[in-house]
Design a protein with these regions (language model features):
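N-terminal helix-loop segment corresponding to the beta1-alpha1 unit
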Residues: 1-149
Length: 149
């Protein structure tokens, strides 16, 4: 709950479902969180985001500063998309979100019904941000990675 003196950003009240990892997606959702959006980062419950282990440097609590910096101001939830209950929770999050951000390989979320077409069937007003290494034309099926590109 907000205190009367708490400054709210211009995106206060906007809910972002963040299915991204590493840099491009987390950086985009970090900027939205910095402006007051509620960002809910979905991570693998066993491993978390790959960058949780990237370092050095690490904080005095042993956390990777890279992960901490690009995931600041976010909430996090561990969901295994291969588990039916967790998948339902992820789909429900996408159904209620104002924005969905993902950077899976093209087609990677189709089998989970978290792709653009599936999400917009139940949430037609959603802003769906799909980040890929090589766009939607030639080479779209290739995996892209920040340092590769």
């Amino acid at each position: 709950m907000s205190s009367p003196n708490q400054v709210r950003g211009p995106l206060d009240g906007v809910v972002i479902a963040d299915f991204s990892r590493v840099l491009a997606g987390p950086y985009a959702s970090m900027l939205l969180a910095d402006f007051g959006a509620t960002v809910i980062k979905v991570e693998d419950p066993d491993r978390g985001d790959d960058t949780r282990q990237w370092g050095p440097p690490f904080t005095s609590q042993g956390k990777a500063t890279y992960f901490e910096s690009v995931n600041r101001n976010k909430q996090s939830i561990g969901l295994d998309l291969r588990d039916s209950k967790d998948l339902y929770r992820a789909q429900n999050l996408a159904r209620k979100a104002d924005v969905v951000i993902e950077n899976f390989k093209v087609g990677g979320l189709d089998k989970f019904k978290l792709d653009y077409h599936s999400v917009t069937k139940t949430n037609p007003q959603v802003v769906y941000c799909s980040i890929s290494g090589f766009g939607s034309k030639e080479g779209k099926e290739l995996p892209g990675y920040d340092l590769l590109i």
